[in-house]
Amino acid sequence: MNTIKKIVLTGGPCAGKTTALVKVIEHFSSLGYKVFTIPEVPTMFTQAGMNYLTSNKDFFYVGEKATLLTQLHLEDSFYKMAQTLEQPVLIVCDRGVMDISAYLSPQQWQDIIGEVGYTQAQLRDERYDAILHLVSAADGAEQFYTTSNNAQRLEKADEKGLQIARELDKRVIEAWTGHPHLRVINNHEDFDNKLNRVLKEISNVLGIPQPIEEERKYIVKLTGNVPNSIDSDIVQTYLAGEPNCEIRLRKRRFEEKEVFVHTTKKRISDTEQIETERQISSNLYESLLQQADPYRQTIKKHRKSFIWKGQYFELDSFESPINDLMILETKGIAKQESVKFPPFIQVAEDITGNTKYYNYNIALKK
């Protein structure tokens, strides 16, 4: 049976999805994949006459429900088509089902998915192999923000429109938070870096060996409140494994919900590794804990995830086995690019590449 992977490209307005889709099709088709792209359903509906800003509540509700049903039908239809092929298939969705929830009240969303016969967990956590969120140009790359590439866009290129776009960016990230393979793609000084990060993240999902890259990490102190952060509690356990292979179990708690993820990082050379990640059930999680590495302790930490000037940050406050360490990490920033530190962060030390501060080594029993 062929391999089928389904990912979502999402993000705020003017994030670069259209250009990224073209790159994805070209790149992975050249590697032998059949690439299907599911079009953005709300844009299709708007072009057909749907008005998402209507004051008619019944029309709005029925329209949003129809949008969801169409999205589900398109995805399921192309998945069935993919199953008939022998070559590996990559299905790329221009936005996914949870994007719809970002434009609804929580109660409206629960009512609609209840009528359709789905749960939040089924739609967010189980339908897709990865979610790639491209940060809007309205946050940190305002000079590139435009509405000319989508006539249906309502967020105009003025200060009010930019603020609306930033707020939508945040709501879309919140809608997908909890998915085990959510990746936020920063804005970059060079747009090609942003596109290359998309290709790298998809390659990881497909199990294609990737160059080993050091993410930028810093020991920091928090000097103020973190605005618009998404908070979660993480319990991380390392399992016993073969040499050059790191196996990690993670339980992440977010808004009273728990997600369990199994991750394997296998180094195949001095410069390349293969990383695989999958969501698992709570029962399998409990069972796999029996294979915990006896030489390592469980890590517990509180994470604040946030975007600042187009760059995505994760701020981890460690609670166990140490409780006086705070590490700030930002992903996908090229070496020649500068990190845009927020004013509420005080940097004590740059620890990029310092193996002492790898979680895997922090967990070592002393």
Which role does the model predict for each range below?
Residues 17:
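Conserved lysine of the Walker
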Residues 7-9:
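Hydrophobic anchor at the beta1->P-loop junction of P-loop NTPases
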Residues 126, 184-187, 192-366:
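Phosphate-end processing signature that detects enzymes handling 5′-triphosphorylated RNA
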Residues 107-174:
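A glycine- and Lys/Arg-enriched "phosphate-lid" helix/loop adjacent to the NTP-binding pocket
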Residues 65-125:
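Glycine-rich phosphate-binding loop used to anchor ATP phosphates in small-molecule kinases
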Residues 13:
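The conserved Walker
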Residues 20:
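Hydrophobic positions on the alpha1 helix immediately C-terminal to the Walker A/P-loop
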Residues 25-70:
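Conserved substrate/cofactor phosphate-moiety recognition/catalytic segment
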